[in-house]
Amino acid sequence: MDLYEVESKIKELEASYNKEADNLMQELNAYKKKSPILPMYGDDPNVDKMIANKNRIIRSQYTRRENKIHKLWEKFYDDVTDIVTAEYNLPTDVAKLVVQQVRDRDIGRSELASYLDHYAIFAETVLDAVF
């Protein structure tokens, strides 16, 4: 349960996820550039209806690509939970709570390991006292 080991594992994990997230973000930006939201003109209701339908399709594609990025980072935090479980010998549910507590603090990922260490040690102490 060395903070340096945990921090290096999380940084390696984050580097791989950052690379994938960058690719997904480039894909999203390329799609936004290729398919911008179309302006409504208001002259002809049929044309506006057609434009509104096209915009709905474009927005759904934006959302689909954005959701891919969100799912990627959710998987990152699941993997961080696995690291916390393994390194601190915590039950999975407790490790999930530790990671969620750190995420709720809305800190940058650069400070993630130190906060995880703090909360994981606290959780470990509580579990030792209870059991």
Predicted regions and their residues:
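Short, charge/polar-rich alpha-helical segments
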Residues: 1-25
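Intrinsic disorder/low-complexity segments
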Residues: 11, 15, 56, 62-63, ...
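Soluble, cytosolic/nucleoplasmic coiled-coil alpha-helices used as oligomeric scaffolds and tethers
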Residues: 30, 34-37, 78, 82
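Extended, amphipathic alpha-helical coiled-coil scaffold segments used for oligomerization/tethering
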Residues: 39-52, 56-59, 91
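A long, low-hydrophobicity, low-complexity, charged/polar interaction segment common
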Residues: 88-131
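Coiled-coil termination/hinge junctions
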Residues: 76-83, 87-91
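Charged, low-complexity interaction regions
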Residues: 33-45, 88, 107-112
